[in-house]
Amino acid sequence: KHSLPDLPYDYGALEPHINAQIMQLHHSKHHAAYVNNLNVTEEKYQEALAKGDVTAQIALQPALKFNGGGHINHSIFWTNLSPNGGGEPKGELLEAIKRDFGSFDKFKEKLTATSVGVQGSGWGWLGFNKERGHLQIAACPNQDPLQGTTGLIPLLGIDVWEHAYYLQYKNVRPDYLKAIWNVINWENVTERYMACKK
């Protein structure tokens, strides 16, 4: 069974950039719901497999993708953030960003624009294309997980569902994007990058 991961910091730790009320609801209610619904869906899926009921298996696919994706995405998201975050990455990750996007500022602009431009709910991602050995920016709708839908390995995800920012930034998604760069945990993103290069 899947369980809700603990946050590596307090709900109020990312203030003033993301307030405690948002973090508490986002983690203890939204992410928890994905975990619970994923467990229920997997149980039903196992039953359908045991019965050889292919129709039921197919009918459960959207719930599996939505709740499984929600759990995968948020588990990455919490570690991508830190009260000691912000600034720029160092070392190999920074070199790769410069190589693939021209400069850190251009990368930031591109990921911001991609995330702001998501229609409705979804995510903006920095991913690693293992075949090409390059970094890539992508957007995924709803809770579609990056790797499961594009093959890119997720390094940095920006949640642009309204529940991630509305209580603080209302409908002004660009202000939320501007703020989130102050709490990006580049150490975590770098660890993910180094791991997929092995």
UniProtKB/Swiss-Prot annotation:
Asked if Signal is a keyword of the record, the answer is no
Stretches that traverse the bilayer: none
Q: Give the domain of life.
A: Eukaryota
* Function noted in UniProt: Destroys superoxide anion radicals which are normally produced within the cells and which are toxic to biological systems.
GO molecular function ontology, one term from the record: manganese ion binding
Q: In this chain, where does the modification N6-succinyllysine occur?
A: 44, 51, 98, 106
Q: What is its EC number?
A: 1.15.1.1
List positions binding Mn(2+): 26, 74, 159, 163
> Could you tell me which species this protein originates from?
Hylobates lar
Cofactors, names only: Mn(2+)
Gene name in the database record = SOD2
Q: Which UniProt keywords apply?
A: Acetylation, Manganese, Metal-binding, Mitochondrion, Nitration, Oxidoreductase, Ubl conjugation
Q: Which GO terms describe its cellular component?
A: mitochondrial matrix
| Membership in a protein family | Belongs to the iron/manganese superoxide dismutase family.
- Full protein name: Superoxide dismutase [Mn], mitochondrial
